[in-house]
Protein backbone atom coordinates (compact mmCIF):
# COMPACT_ATOMS: atom_id res chain seq x y z
CA UNK A 1 0.00 0.00 0.00
CA UNK A 2 2.83 2.40 0.86
CA UNK A 3 4.38 2.05 -2.58
CA UNK A 4 1.15 2.83 -4.36
CA UNK A 5 0.36 5.96 -2.41
CA UNK A 6 3.74 7.43 -3.35
CA UNK A 7 2.59 7.80 -6.97
CA UNK A 8 0.94 11.20 -7.26
CA UNK A 9 -2.79 11.39 -7.87
CA UNK A 10 -2.15 12.68 -11.39
CA UNK A 11 -0.20 9.57 -12.38
CA UNK A 12 -2.71 7.30 -10.67
CA UNK A 13 -5.49 8.85 -12.75
CA UNK A 14 -3.53 8.74 -16.01
CA UNK A 15 -2.69 5.11 -15.26
CA UNK A 16 -6.35 4.39 -14.52
CA UNK A 17 -7.43 5.92 -17.84
CA UNK A 18 -4.76 4.02 -19.79
CA UNK A 19 -5.44 0.64 -18.16
CA UNK A 20 -9.19 1.17 -18.48
CA UNK A 21 -8.82 1.68 -22.21
CA UNK A 22 -6.32 -1.17 -22.61
CA UNK A 23 -8.28 -3.75 -20.62
CA UNK A 24 -11.53 -2.62 -22.23
CA UNK A 25 -10.29 -4.17 -25.48
CA UNK A 26 -10.23 -7.74 -24.18
CA UNK A 27 -11.55 -8.07 -20.61
CA UNK A 28 -14.42 -10.59 -20.46
CA UNK A 29 -17.76 -8.91 -19.74
CA UNK A 30 -18.47 -10.72 -16.42
CA UNK A 31 -15.13 -9.46 -15.03
CA UNK A 32 -15.62 -5.95 -16.39
CA UNK A 33 -19.05 -5.81 -14.75
CA UNK A 34 -17.42 -6.20 -11.33
CA UNK A 35 -15.69 -2.83 -11.84
CA UNK A 36 -18.88 -1.30 -13.18
CA UNK A 37 -20.68 -2.47 -10.04
CA UNK A 38 -18.04 -0.65 -7.98
CA UNK A 39 -18.67 2.45 -10.11
CA UNK A 40 -22.36 2.33 -9.32
CA UNK A 41 -21.69 2.05 -5.59
CA UNK A 42 -18.96 4.68 -5.52
CA UNK A 43 -21.02 7.07 -7.66
CA UNK A 44 -23.95 6.70 -5.29
CA UNK A 45 -21.68 7.25 -2.32
CA UNK A 46 -20.40 10.47 -3.90
CA UNK A 47 -23.98 11.64 -4.36
CA UNK A 48 -24.51 10.97 -0.66
CA UNK A 49 -21.27 12.67 0.39
CA UNK A 50 -21.43 15.83 -1.73
CA UNK A 51 -23.89 17.79 0.48
CA UNK A 52 -21.83 16.80 3.55
CA UNK A 53 -18.67 18.00 1.81
CA UNK A 54 -20.35 21.33 1.01
CA UNK A 55 -21.49 21.86 4.60
CA UNK A 56 -18.18 20.71 6.08
CA UNK A 57 -16.08 23.02 3.93
CA UNK A 58 -18.19 26.13 3.44
CA UNK A 59 -19.44 26.81 7.00
CA UNK A 60 -15.96 27.09 8.59
CA UNK A 61 -14.55 28.94 5.56
CA UNK A 62 -17.21 31.64 5.75
CA UNK A 63 -17.29 31.92 9.53
CA UNK A 64 -13.48 32.24 9.63
CA UNK A 65 -13.57 35.00 7.02
CA UNK A 66 -16.05 36.94 9.10
CA UNK A 67 -14.17 36.91 12.38
CA UNK A 68 -10.62 37.24 11.05
CA UNK A 69 -8.18 40.09 10.65
CA UNK A 70 -10.84 42.58 9.60
CA UNK A 71 -10.30 44.94 6.70
CA UNK A 72 -7.21 43.41 5.14
CA UNK A 73 -8.78 39.97 5.15
CA UNK A 74 -11.92 41.25 3.42
CA UNK A 75 -9.86 43.14 0.84
CA UNK A 76 -7.79 40.05 0.05
CA UNK A 77 -10.83 37.77 -0.05
CA UNK A 78 -12.68 40.20 -2.33
CA UNK A 79 -9.73 40.42 -4.73
CA UNK A 80 -9.32 36.63 -4.72
CA UNK A 81 -13.04 36.18 -5.42
CA UNK A 82 -12.96 38.81 -8.17
CA UNK A 83 -9.94 37.17 -9.78
CA UNK A 84 -11.62 33.76 -9.61
CA UNK A 85 -14.86 35.02 -11.16
CA UNK A 86 -12.96 36.93 -13.86
CA UNK A 87 -11.12 33.71 -14.67
CA UNK A 88 -14.45 31.89 -15.01
CA UNK A 89 -15.97 34.42 -17.41
CA UNK A 90 -12.73 34.80 -19.36
CA UNK A 91 -12.71 31.01 -19.85
CA UNK A 92 -16.41 30.88 -20.67
CA UNK A 93 -16.25 33.45 -23.46
CA UNK A 94 -12.98 32.03 -24.82
CA UNK A 95 -14.62 28.61 -24.79
CA UNK A 96 -17.68 29.93 -26.63
CA UNK A 97 -15.32 31.17 -29.34
CA UNK A 98 -13.02 28.15 -29.62
CA UNK A 99 -14.80 24.96 -28.54
CA UNK A 100 -17.52 24.68 -31.21
CA UNK A 101 -14.73 24.33 -33.80
CA UNK A 102 -12.96 21.63 -31.78
CA UNK A 103 -15.80 19.62 -30.30
CA UNK A 104 -18.19 17.88 -32.60
CA UNK A 105 -21.17 16.44 -30.83
CA UNK A 106 -21.25 12.75 -31.62
CA UNK A 107 -24.64 11.17 -31.21
CA UNK A 108 -23.04 8.14 -29.59
CA UNK A 109 -21.18 10.11 -26.93
CA UNK A 110 -24.28 12.18 -26.31
CA UNK A 111 -26.31 9.07 -25.69
CA UNK A 112 -23.75 7.79 -23.21
CA UNK A 113 -23.18 10.94 -21.20
CA UNK A 114 -26.82 11.98 -21.12
CA UNK A 115 -27.86 8.59 -19.92
CA UNK A 116 -25.31 6.21 -18.44
CA UNK A 117 -27.98 3.53 -18.80
CA UNK A 118 -26.91 3.42 -22.45
CA UNK A 119 -23.48 2.16 -21.43
CA UNK A 120 -22.65 -1.32 -22.64
CA UNK A 121 -22.06 -2.79 -19.19
CA UNK A 122 -24.59 -2.89 -16.37
CA UNK A 123 -23.65 -3.32 -12.69
CA UNK A 124 -24.55 -6.61 -11.01
CA UNK A 125 -26.48 -4.70 -8.36
CA UNK A 126 -26.89 -1.15 -7.07
CA UNK A 127 -27.48 0.20 -3.59
CA UNK A 128 -29.45 3.43 -3.37
CA UNK A 129 -27.74 6.00 -1.14
CA UNK A 130 -30.01 9.02 -0.92
CA UNK A 131 -28.23 12.25 0.00
CA UNK A 132 -29.11 13.62 3.46
CA UNK A 133 -29.77 17.04 1.88
CA UNK A 134 -30.42 18.50 -1.51
CA UNK A 135 -27.40 20.32 -3.03
CA UNK A 136 -29.01 23.77 -2.97
CA UNK A 137 -30.28 23.16 0.57
CA UNK A 138 -26.74 22.33 1.65
CA UNK A 139 -25.34 25.48 0.00
CA UNK A 140 -27.97 27.78 1.50
CA UNK A 141 -27.68 26.18 4.92
CA UNK A 142 -23.89 26.60 4.79
CA UNK A 143 -24.17 30.29 3.91
CA UNK A 144 -26.75 30.99 6.61
CA UNK A 145 -24.85 29.17 9.34
CA UNK A 146 -21.44 30.40 8.14
CA UNK A 147 -22.49 34.05 8.02
CA UNK A 148 -24.36 33.63 11.28
CA UNK A 149 -21.32 32.19 13.03
CA UNK A 150 -19.17 35.09 11.91
CA UNK A 151 -21.67 37.48 13.54
CA UNK A 152 -22.47 35.52 16.71
CA UNK A 153 -19.94 35.11 19.53
CA UNK A 154 -20.82 31.45 20.10
CA UNK A 155 -17.88 29.06 20.16
CA UNK A 156 -19.74 25.76 20.53
CA UNK A 157 -21.14 25.63 17.02
CA UNK A 158 -17.98 27.11 15.54
CA UNK A 159 -15.87 24.37 17.08
CA UNK A 160 -18.41 21.78 15.97
CA UNK A 161 -18.17 23.16 12.43
CA UNK A 162 -14.38 22.95 12.60
CA UNK A 163 -14.57 19.34 13.82
CA UNK A 164 -17.01 18.51 11.04
CA UNK A 165 -14.64 20.11 8.54
CA UNK A 166 -11.87 17.82 9.80
CA UNK A 167 -14.14 14.80 9.37
CA UNK A 168 -15.04 15.83 5.83
CA UNK A 169 -11.38 16.50 4.98
CA UNK A 170 -10.50 13.02 6.23
CA UNK A 171 -13.35 11.56 4.19
CA UNK A 172 -11.96 13.25 1.07
CA UNK A 173 -8.31 12.43 1.77
CA UNK A 174 -8.66 8.86 3.06
CA UNK A 175 -11.73 7.48 1.28
CA UNK A 176 -12.73 9.43 -1.81
CA UNK A 177 -9.37 10.45 -3.32
CA UNK A 178 -7.75 6.98 -2.90
CA UNK A 179 -10.74 5.30 -4.59
CA UNK A 180 -11.02 7.86 -7.40
CA UNK A 181 -8.50 6.16 -9.72
CA UNK A 182 -10.47 2.91 -9.47
CA UNK A 183 -13.69 4.80 -10.22
CA UNK A 184 -12.14 6.48 -13.25
CA UNK A 185 -10.69 3.14 -14.39
CA UNK A 186 -14.18 1.64 -14.34
CA UNK A 187 -15.73 4.54 -16.24
CA UNK A 188 -13.11 4.36 -19.00
CA UNK A 189 -13.33 0.58 -19.09
CA UNK A 190 -17.06 0.87 -19.63
CA UNK A 191 -16.70 3.58 -22.26
CA UNK A 192 -14.14 1.48 -24.15
CA UNK A 193 -16.47 -1.51 -24.18
CA UNK A 194 -19.28 0.82 -25.27
CA UNK A 195 -17.00 1.96 -28.07
CA UNK A 196 -16.86 5.71 -27.72
CA UNK A 197 -13.65 6.24 -25.84
CA UNK A 198 -11.72 7.49 -28.90
CA UNK A 199 -13.98 10.49 -29.45
CA UNK A 200 -13.79 11.42 -25.77
CA UNK A 201 -9.99 11.16 -25.58
CA UNK A 202 -9.53 13.31 -28.69
CA UNK A 203 -11.72 15.99 -27.11
CA UNK A 204 -9.75 15.69 -23.84
CA UNK A 205 -6.48 16.40 -25.64
CA UNK A 206 -7.91 19.45 -27.43
CA UNK A 207 -9.34 20.89 -24.22
CA UNK A 208 -6.06 20.46 -22.38
CA UNK A 209 -4.21 22.37 -25.12
CA UNK A 210 -6.80 25.19 -25.07
CA UNK A 211 -6.64 25.49 -21.28
CA UNK A 212 -2.86 25.50 -21.36
CA UNK A 213 -2.90 28.54 -23.66
CA UNK A 214 -5.69 30.25 -21.69
CA UNK A 215 -3.94 29.92 -18.34
CA UNK A 216 -0.86 31.69 -19.70
CA UNK A 217 -3.06 34.53 -20.99
CA UNK A 218 -4.82 34.71 -17.62
CA UNK A 219 -1.51 35.05 -15.77
CA UNK A 220 -0.44 37.83 -18.14
CA UNK A 221 -3.70 39.71 -17.45
CA UNK A 222 -3.31 39.27 -13.67
CA UNK A 223 0.27 40.52 -13.68
CA UNK A 224 -0.36 43.43 -16.03
CA UNK A 225 -3.10 44.58 -13.60
CA UNK A 226 -0.82 44.04 -10.61
CA UNK A 227 1.93 45.93 -12.41
CA UNK A 228 -0.34 48.89 -13.16
CA UNK A 229 -1.73 49.06 -9.61
CA UNK A 230 1.60 48.39 -7.88
CA UNK A 231 3.57 50.51 -10.39
CA UNK A 232 6.00 47.70 -11.13
CA UNK A 233 7.12 45.96 -14.33
CA UNK A 234 4.58 43.13 -14.93
CA UNK A 235 6.99 40.86 -16.78
CA UNK A 236 9.64 41.16 -14.09
CA UNK A 237 7.00 40.38 -11.44
CA UNK A 238 5.91 37.32 -13.42
CA UNK A 239 9.49 36.18 -14.03
CA UNK A 240 10.21 36.31 -10.28
CA UNK A 241 7.17 34.09 -9.62
CA UNK A 242 8.34 31.34 -12.00
CA UNK A 243 10.06 29.24 -9.27
CA UNK A 244 6.69 29.05 -7.49
CA UNK A 245 5.06 28.02 -10.79
CA UNK A 246 7.62 25.25 -11.24
CA UNK A 247 7.30 24.04 -7.64
CA UNK A 248 3.52 23.86 -7.93
CA UNK A 249 3.84 21.82 -11.12
CA UNK A 250 5.73 19.29 -9.04
CA UNK A 251 3.75 19.31 -5.80
CA UNK A 252 0.27 19.86 -7.31
CA UNK A 253 -0.65 21.48 -4.03
CA UNK A 254 -0.94 25.21 -3.30
CA UNK A 255 -0.31 24.61 0.39
CA UNK A 256 2.93 22.70 -0.21
CA UNK A 257 4.22 25.50 -2.44
CA UNK A 258 3.70 28.30 0.15
CA UNK A 259 7.39 28.64 1.19
CA UNK A 260 8.50 29.23 -2.40
CA UNK A 261 5.58 31.50 -3.27
CA UNK A 262 6.31 33.53 -0.14
CA UNK A 263 10.02 33.93 -0.90
CA UNK A 264 9.38 35.01 -4.51
CA UNK A 265 6.62 37.44 -3.49
CA UNK A 266 8.96 39.17 -1.03
CA UNK A 267 11.54 39.26 -3.83
CA UNK A 268 8.93 41.20 -5.85
CA UNK A 269 9.16 43.98 -3.25
CA UNK A 270 6.01 43.15 -1.30
CA UNK A 271 6.38 44.01 2.39
CA UNK A 272 7.04 40.97 4.55
CA UNK A 273 3.97 41.53 6.75
CA UNK A 274 1.62 41.59 3.79
CA UNK A 275 3.28 38.65 2.04
CA UNK A 276 3.13 36.37 5.10
CA UNK A 277 -0.56 37.23 5.47
CA UNK A 278 -1.69 37.13 1.82
CA UNK A 279 0.20 34.11 0.48
CA UNK A 280 -1.01 31.41 2.93
CA UNK A 281 -4.54 32.85 2.74
CA UNK A 282 -4.56 32.88 -1.07
CA UNK A 283 -3.19 29.34 -1.20
CA UNK A 284 -6.57 28.36 0.23
CA UNK A 285 -8.96 30.91 -1.26
CA UNK A 286 -7.54 32.00 -4.63
CA UNK A 287 -8.13 29.28 -7.21
CA UNK A 288 -8.35 31.09 -10.54
CA UNK A 289 -6.60 28.24 -12.37
CA UNK A 290 -8.96 25.65 -10.93
CA UNK A 291 -11.96 27.80 -11.87
CA UNK A 292 -10.65 28.03 -15.41
CA UNK A 293 -10.29 24.26 -15.68
CA UNK A 294 -13.68 23.50 -14.17
CA UNK A 295 -15.47 26.02 -16.39
CA UNK A 296 -13.74 24.82 -19.55
CA UNK A 297 -14.22 21.12 -18.78
CA UNK A 298 -17.87 21.64 -17.90
CA UNK A 299 -18.48 23.45 -21.20
CA UNK A 300 -16.68 20.77 -23.18
CA UNK A 301 -18.55 17.90 -21.57
CA UNK A 302 -21.87 19.69 -22.09
CA UNK A 303 -21.08 20.35 -25.76
CA UNK A 304 -19.97 16.76 -26.28
CA UNK A 305 -23.17 15.43 -24.83
CA UNK A 306 -25.38 17.92 -26.64
CA UNK A 307 -26.51 19.79 -23.52
CA UNK A 308 -27.31 23.45 -24.25
CA UNK A 309 -24.57 25.85 -23.10
CA UNK A 310 -26.04 29.26 -22.32
CA UNK A 311 -24.68 32.38 -20.69
CA UNK A 312 -27.36 32.76 -18.00
CA UNK A 313 -26.77 29.26 -16.61
CA UNK A 314 -23.03 29.71 -16.69
CA UNK A 315 -23.09 33.17 -15.10
CA UNK A 316 -24.84 31.79 -12.04
CA UNK A 317 -22.59 28.77 -12.10
CA UNK A 318 -19.38 30.86 -12.23
CA UNK A 319 -20.49 33.18 -9.40
CA UNK A 320 -21.28 30.13 -7.23
CA UNK A 321 -18.08 28.43 -8.32
CA UNK A 322 -16.10 31.42 -7.03
CA UNK A 323 -17.58 30.96 -3.55
CA UNK A 324 -17.13 27.19 -3.68
CA UNK A 325 -13.48 27.62 -4.69
CA UNK A 326 -12.89 29.91 -1.71
CA UNK A 327 -14.13 27.05 0.48
CA UNK A 328 -12.30 24.26 -1.36
CA UNK A 329 -9.47 22.59 0.56
CA UNK A 330 -5.94 23.03 -0.82
CA UNK A 331 -5.33 19.31 -1.38
CA UNK A 332 -4.88 17.66 -4.79
CA UNK A 333 -8.35 17.15 -6.24
CA UNK A 334 -9.94 19.24 -3.48
CA UNK A 335 -11.37 21.88 -5.78
CA UNK A 336 -13.17 19.45 -8.06
CA UNK A 337 -14.61 17.59 -5.06
CA UNK A 338 -16.05 20.84 -3.72
CA UNK A 339 -17.37 21.79 -7.17
CA UNK A 340 -19.23 18.53 -7.81
CA UNK A 341 -22.16 19.89 -5.82
CA UNK A 342 -22.83 22.85 -8.08
CA UNK A 343 -22.02 20.88 -11.24
CA UNK A 344 -24.83 18.57 -10.23
CA UNK A 345 -27.15 21.20 -8.79
CA UNK A 346 -26.77 23.98 -11.36
CA UNK A 347 -25.68 22.30 -14.59
CA UNK A 348 -27.38 18.94 -14.07
CA UNK A 349 -24.26 16.73 -14.28
CA UNK A 350 -24.97 13.05 -13.61
CA UNK A 351 -22.46 10.49 -12.31
CA UNK A 352 -20.83 9.74 -15.66
CA UNK A 353 -20.42 13.42 -16.52
CA UNK A 354 -19.01 14.00 -13.02
CA UNK A 355 -16.50 11.16 -13.40
CA UNK A 356 -15.33 12.51 -16.78
CA UNK A 357 -15.10 15.91 -15.17
CA UNK A 358 -12.91 14.55 -12.35
CA UNK A 359 -10.67 12.65 -14.77
CA UNK A 360 -10.23 15.65 -17.04
CA UNK A 361 -9.66 17.98 -14.10
CA UNK A 362 -7.03 15.83 -12.43
CA UNK A 363 -5.29 15.12 -15.75
CA UNK A 364 -4.19 18.77 -15.72
CA UNK A 365 -4.14 19.34 -12.00
CA UNK A 366 -0.54 20.47 -12.01
CA UNK A 367 -0.78 23.51 -14.24
CA UNK A 368 -4.07 24.58 -12.68
CA UNK A 369 -2.32 24.67 -9.31
CA UNK A 370 0.68 26.43 -10.87
CA UNK A 371 -1.69 29.07 -12.23
CA UNK A 372 -3.31 29.48 -8.79
CA UNK A 373 -0.09 30.04 -6.85
CA UNK A 374 1.51 32.28 -9.46
CA UNK A 375 -1.59 34.48 -9.37
CA UNK A 376 -1.24 34.69 -5.58
CA UNK A 377 1.91 36.70 -6.21
CA UNK A 378 -0.07 39.22 -8.26
CA UNK A 379 -2.72 39.55 -5.56
CA UNK A 380 -0.03 40.18 -2.93
CA UNK A 381 1.35 43.08 -4.99
CA UNK A 382 -2.15 44.62 -5.25
CA UNK A 383 -2.96 44.18 -1.54
CA UNK A 384 0.44 45.62 -0.62
CA UNK A 385 -0.30 48.72 -2.71
CA UNK A 386 -3.80 49.16 -1.22
CA UNK A 387 -2.43 48.72 2.29
CA UNK A 388 0.42 51.15 1.58
CA UNK A 389 -2.05 53.81 0.43
CA UNK A 390 -4.12 53.39 3.59
CA UNK A 391 -1.02 53.74 5.78
CA UNK A 392 0.03 56.92 3.97
CA UNK A 393 -3.42 58.41 4.55
CA UNK A 394 -3.22 57.50 8.23
CA UNK A 395 0.17 59.19 8.60
CA UNK A 396 -0.90 62.39 6.82
CA UNK A 397 -4.18 62.83 8.66
Named regions from a protein language model:
Residues 41, 45, 58-59, 76-81, ...:
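Transmembrane helix-bundle signature of multi-pass membrane transporters/permeases
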Residues 103, 295-397:
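Transmembrane alpha-helical segments and their short flanking loops
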Residues 34, 70, 74, 197-205, ...:
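Membrane-water interface of transmembrane alpha-helices in multipass transporters/channels
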Residues 28, 62-71, 100-104, 150-155, ...:
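Juxtamembrane helix-boundary/capping and inter-helix hinge elements in multi-pass membrane proteins
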Amino acid sequence: VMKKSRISLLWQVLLAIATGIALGQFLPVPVARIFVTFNGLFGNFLTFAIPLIIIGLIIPAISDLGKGAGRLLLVTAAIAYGSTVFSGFFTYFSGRAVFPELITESAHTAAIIDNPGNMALKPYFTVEMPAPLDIMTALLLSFCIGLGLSAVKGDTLRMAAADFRDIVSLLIAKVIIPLLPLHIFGIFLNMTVSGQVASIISVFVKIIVVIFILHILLLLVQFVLAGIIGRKNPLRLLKNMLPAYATALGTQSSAATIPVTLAQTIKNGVSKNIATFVIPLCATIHLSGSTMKITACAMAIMMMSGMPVNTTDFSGFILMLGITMVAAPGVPGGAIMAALGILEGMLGFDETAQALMIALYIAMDSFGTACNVTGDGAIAVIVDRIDGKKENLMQHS
